[in-house]
């Protein structure tokens, strides 16, 4: 499949830090490439319709996020964690988390409490560290396909425009913050 692949580079990181917004786009650590779509037991194949560009994605691309974040993410990776997909003709929002159950691990205390966003095993198990969009083993939404477990797929009601539905993940983050 075709995908935009992010590959971190220390020289590019320091160049981007130095040049700031004047950093030439052609030097971004991002390239269009043909990448294989892995097979994973228990994961479904979801065709990507749209994927957002988050501030965290831009921070990576323009050198605002330091390479020290790598213990929580794994690269090179197909970015994109705000994902609107299509499954069997229906639109679905894809939750990008890769918590204990996704990693084939027994639930950690946070996952047992229903706090999967605070999973203590985000860097453990057979999958590389990180969530969809920041994981070298599973591609994010800047590719043609993603893999997700059925529990991570949330149906979008008919009639909701795709350009709005793609904001399901950031909306969920806001609502979660308001409910705390």
PLM-predicted stretches and their roles:
Residues 70, 81, 99-180:
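NAD(P)H dinucleotide-binding glycine-rich loop of Rossmann-like/cofactor-binding domains
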Residues 8, 90, 175-179:
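Charged, amphipathic alpha-helical interaction segments
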Residues 1-79, 144:
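Short N-terminal strand-loop motif that marks the start
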Residues 36-51, 66-113, 152-159:
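Glycine-rich beta-strand-centered segment in the early N-terminal region that forms part
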